[in-house]
Amino acid sequence: MITLGHMLALGAVLFAISLAGIFLNRKNVIVLLMSIELMLLSVNVNFVAFSRQLGDPSGQLFVFFILTVAAAEAAIGLAILVTLFRTRRTINVGEVDSLKG
């Protein structure tokens, strides 16, 4: 049987993997976006786990709102990435310094 501890451990492992992805690979925009999405997924796992434990469906409802925001974030991030690649011919974050004043 899957307990609350198992679900929280899974959420913690996913969150740690996403943090490692963000801190170890800061130059590739695609890896950064994937790590942020994985971080949101780990939060969703924790919401569902607590919602199941407490018998309250509001946590599961909140997951749908998070998924909606995550989908919008991914769409906007990929649109920025495509525009960046078309103008600079790179997706390396270190080479994009056009906003520096």
UniProtKB/Swiss-Prot annotation:
Alphabetically ordered keywords of this record: Cell inner membrane, Cell membrane, Membrane, NAD, Quinone, Translocase, Transmembrane, Transmembrane helix, Transport, Ubiquinone
EC number annotated for this UniProt entry: 7.1.1.-
Pfam families the UniProt entry points to: Oxidored_q2
GO cellular component terms listed in the entry, alphabetical order: NADH dehydrogenase complex; plasma membrane
Recorded coiled-coil stretches: none
Gene3D superfamilies associated with the record: 1.10.287.3510
Catalytic activity: a quinone + NADH + 5 H(+)(in) = a quinol + NAD(+) + 4 H(+)(out)
GO BP annotation list: ATP synthesis coupled electron transport
Mode of membrane association: Multi-pass membrane protein
Keyword NAD: yes
UniProt GO MF annotations: NADH:ubiquinone reductase (non-electrogenic) activity; quinone binding
Membrane-traversing stretches: 4-24, 30-50, 62-82
Domain of life: Bacteria
Compartments where found: Cell inner membrane
Family classification: Belongs to the complex I subunit 4L family.
Assembly mode: NDH-1 is composed of 14 different subunits. Subunits NuoA, H, J, K, L, M, N constitute the membrane sector of the complex.
Role this protein plays: NDH-1 shuttles electrons from NADH, via FMN and iron-sulfur (Fe-S) centers, to quinones in the respiratory chain. The immediate electron acceptor for the enzyme in this species is believed to be ubiquinone. Couples the redox reaction to proton translocation (for every two electrons transferred, four hydrogen ions are translocated across the cytoplasmic membrane), and thus conserves the redox energy in a proton gradient.
Protein name: NADH-quinone oxidoreductase subunit K
Organism classification: Bacteria, Pseudomonadati, Pseudomonadota, Gammaproteobacteria, Lysobacterales
Gene: nuoK
